[in-house]
Amino acid sequence: MEDPGETGAHPLGATNLNFVPGHQQKEKPSTDPLYDTPDTRGVQAGGSQQPARTVSLRERLLITRPVWLQLRANAAAALHVLRTEPPGTFLVRKSNTRQCQALCVRLPEASGPSFVSSHYIEESTGGVSLEGSELMFQDLVQLICGYCRTRAIHQAATHKELEAISHLGMEFWSSSLNTKDQQRPSEAPPIPRLKARSPQELDQGTGAALCFFNPLFPGDLGPTKREKFKRSFKVRVSTETSSPLSPPAVPPPPVPVLPGTSSSQTERLPPRQLLQRESSVGYRVPGSAASPCLPPLPSLQEVDCCSPSSSEEEGSSGSPTTSPRLSRPRHRRPLLRSMSSAFCSLLAPERQVGRAATMLMQNRYTAVGQLVQDLLTQVRAGPEPRELQGIRQALSRARAMLSAELGPEKLLPPERLELVLEKSLHRSVLKPLRPILAARLRRRLSADGSLGRLAEGFRLARTQGPGAFGSHLTLSSPVETEQVRQKLLQLLRAYSPSAQVKWLLQACKLLYTALKSQAGENAGADEFLPLLSLVLAQCDLPDLLLEAEYMSELLEPTLLTGEGGYYLTSLSASLALLSGLSQARALPLSPAQELQRSLALWEQRRLPATHSFQHLLRVAYQDPSTGCTSKTLAVPPGSSIATLSQLCATKFRVTQPDAFGLFLYKDQGYHRLPPEALAHRLPATGYLIYRRAERPETQGAVAEKAKTGSKGPEAGAWEEETGGLNREGKPRIAVDQEGKDQARGGHIGPEEQKAEGSQALEE
């Protein structure tokens, strides 16, 4: 068990809590007898059963609280109880040293010498949370619900059975009700058996469907059945229409053995290890800065203005009247190919994750469901100040909770998972609230006169032409204007802010194509903003003002740091410039000044603070036994290399930290860093490596350099060896940092810096 004063990794990064029974299932009426306690197989017995009622996850935790909440137990007692339990089993005890509650979780055997991890629980006025985590819950039961991964250990489905378990208290762990199968690994759920049905049942259609689709949970047999389904249909699906499903790494096993199957068929079953998903690796830094970011929006060069976008499916019923489409009619695909594509899309991991996220958000008994349903009720009740900002904060919190719930299934990579969850939240929250929010924005902007000033600015711009903006550029033909108008109409129909930004990028690309044909390749913001303002006036869509505010407030902050945020700000600046035409001003602001003023106001309110990203360092770890891995560590400003080395020893679980050290990998060589050097003042032309110091001469040279310090003439030699610092004294090492230059449209993001870190590991 870990030291009580030293917290382990985040529970989501290791093993999820699985003491609570499996999925919420309704009790089906049965003629079997029902007793007050379940038998060892989890089968109910006793008298007649009560009417069907769902036992929620929160109710199970509340009823069985005397079993898992052991405030009188110490660390040794928790270790004694959890040593024979399967991974994921948990207890809550009280720490005598910290005077707070501690969540003890059983880890897998392969996780290291310590098979029990302790996580301290912090209590505040806003609720409870794990130490180092920003996820806040109302109470302890709500916290455990947020981190529980449902797994059917006990099939207790009634209140009587749960109360019988509750009466045992601490004795439950050694009782006959706590049964564990010793013949198989505890972390591997059993293979479900298929129930054979008679031909009469199949003809009548009273049973289930003929095709079995594996649900999202537990998910161990998902790729196997998916592969069988693909092999059962002799249909060749082209790469253009097939879903991104990959075959399993090993040949699929046969169908689970039915009752009465011969032993020879049983011997052909592969071992259970082949069905296991790969374990999660890496380290999740607490806080929003370390959560998986959404993939960036496509750049202006990557946007295809002529191809249909996926956001076309997100139109709302209350869309404005559209003009005739200018695109050529689509060719209808063959029926067989369409059917095969539809079947494969049902099995796509994105659809499975989306359906699971929707079910969690619709279930009020879950933590994320309660958050989403309360948000919908609150917004529908009436307007509040800073309403859109509150909705964005609730969406970010709900996405973090969904990621914690669905992330351990490893169906999707982290970036793709965050994107799918964000789309699911938009569909479940923003789609029903879209008409309400649009009506409130329109009412507010009409009351303060913003829409009236914009409509008057549109009229003046159409009358004066390009001269109203001090420019001579315009679109050459009405067809180009109509194409841009169609993109903006699609923007008005969409309810998802990310889809709206994609339509905006397509419209801006059309404008830039026309701009380059007139002003050349060197055209910039001073030429683009007048052209955008003129085209907006010709399109005559005043609702773009409320859509600009809708996108600016509800778009994920990490998506505002690229070209999408740049052109969204350009749209806001252009609308502000048009609104100013109706005011009696002798000399309006120039387009560049108007854009800079709008950018400055927007950055202060919406973009994430840069200081929250500048304390993250990515360190690679060379383990002689398991190979290379890397983690992103939160290092406070002003920390030394000695402090960072201690943090690396803790996070990488090094048993002999004195034998390891931090090295700077540069010029095909390792250079050990002195302990007194500052972690954030390292050069940017290398990579941080935490490895074993195997060569004594390296240690001696480093010790000699450490003695000299930075006062003597040797300090310059060390700076020259390690690359030195820039003149501003800022760190230039390849770490996960973001700056304000990226927020203004820079193309270098944190994901590219992480990719550089992975290249260092390969070297």
UniProtKB/Swiss-Prot annotation:
Post-translational modification Omega-N-methylarginine, affected residues: 681
Post-translational note: Phosphorylated on tyrosine residues by ABL1 and ABL2. Phosphorylation at Ser-340 by PRKD1 induces interaction with 14-3-3 proteins.
Annotated positions of the N-acetylmethionine modification: 1
Ras-associating domain sequence ranges: 613-695
Protein localization: Cytoplasm; Membrane; Cytoplasm, Cytoskeleton
Protein name per its UniProtKB record: Ras and Rab interactor 1
InterPro entries: RA_dom, RIN1_SH2, SH2, SH2_dom_sf, VPS9, Vps9-like, VPS9_dom_sf
